[in-house]
Amino acid sequence: MFPKKKFLRCFCISRGRSSNRITLESPERNIPTGLRTYTASFNYLENPTSRMLDFSTSLTPDGLPDFTQTFRLPKTPTPSRTTSPKKVIIVNPGNIKCLGVQSQTKTTYITMPLMQVVREKLSTL
């Protein structure tokens, strides 16, 4: 997956004295404590990269990320299904001659004696 020179070596776990001869001691007595010491090393190459999961960014000589990479886009856009021309078929199930003209509808009103009383009271207000 990664070249051998770029991968991070595993942490070396040791108790008491580590390989670099540092001893952790308690301040009251000069007794080495049983704490673990973790050491890690990383081999840098001439062109280091900053890695985060599957994303890599080139670094400048100052160690800052270089975002000047540009990606070439196709010159002609590929047509999508929504922009390509389509045939539209209008179905007329009721055999209506003019589709955008509304026909007049006949409405009938049924008046009851109670409705007439309500209308009279409202008209006197």
Curated annotation (Swiss-Prot):
Keywords: Host-virus interaction, Inhibition of host innate immune response by virus, Suppressor of RNA silencing, Viral immunoevasion. One of its GO terms (biological process) is symbiont-mediated suppression of host innate immune response. Pathogenicity determinant. May act as a suppressor of RNA-mediated gene silencing, also known as post-transcriptional gene silencing (PTGS), a mechanism of plant viral defense that limits the accumulation of viral RNAs. Belongs to the geminiviridae protein AC4/C4 family. This is Protein AC4.
